[in-house]
């Protein structure tokens, strides 16, 4: 599996998670059926952030095997 991850936000983008230590990122890899059905490895990313800071940030990841973008849902951390 060869995937690179990108942060898209109103403030710009980054090709890595460096500089975002204030964010809590949980990565869950889902590969059981995706390779058989779609021929690619899917990676699900959940980005958690403080609701009072940068509430509009989104998270996307690019799978370099297919050059296909997957939009990933972003949730705030519950109180």
Curated annotation (Swiss-Prot):
Top-level taxon in the UniProt lineage: Eukaryota
Additional observations: Partially overlaps HED1.
Protein's recorded name: Putative uncharacterized protein YDR015C
């Amino acid at each position: 599996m060869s995937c690179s991850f990108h942060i898209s936000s109103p403030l710009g983008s980054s090709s890595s998670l460096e500089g975002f230590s204030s964010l809590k990122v949980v990565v869950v890899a889902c590969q059981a059926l995706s390779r058989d059905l779609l021929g690619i490895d899917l990676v699900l990313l959940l980005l958690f952030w403080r609701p009072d800071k940068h509430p509009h940030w989104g998270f996307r990841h690019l799978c370099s095997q297919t050059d296909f973008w997957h939009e990933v849902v972003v949730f705030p951390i519950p109180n």
